UniProtKB/Swiss-Prot annotation:
This is Pyrimidine/purine nucleoside phosphorylase. The keyword Transferase applies. It comes from Vibrio vulnificus (strain YJ016). HAMAP family: Nucleos_phosphorylase_PpnP (MF_01537). Belongs to the nucleoside phosphorylase PpnP family. The gene is ppnP.
Length: 93
């Protein structure tokens, strides 16, 4: 089954799915600043575009380009700065 999600007044949209018992989602973020909370640990891979992120405990912002990935701890949050429309894959670890 595919689960549709919309966040931040429709500026972030994703499609969630399960493959061989593993949950993932693919989506697009329009330019803007966002804060996401996590329940489970996540790995985010930038498919096209770029994400500038700051996780809880980080002192500086980090930029991830297409093909690069970062992980976020469960039960935490992270801030995103999106300058161009960006596609991503989120894997729930």
């Amino acid at each position: 089954m595919i689960k549709e999600n919309s966040y931040f007044a429709g500026n972030v949209k994703s499609l969630g799915f399960n493959q061989q018992g593993e949950d993932s989602s693919v989506g697009v973020m329009l330019p803007g600043n966002y804060t996401f909370g996590t329940d489970a640990p996540e790995r985010m891979t930038v498919v096209k575009g770029a994400l500038v992120i700051k996780r809880e405990g980080d002192e500086e912002w980090s930029t991830y380009q297409a093909g690069e990935a970062f992980e976020v701890a469960g039960k935490s949050s992270f801030d995103l700065q999106v300058e161009v429309a960006t596609a991503y894959l989120c894997e729930y670890l």
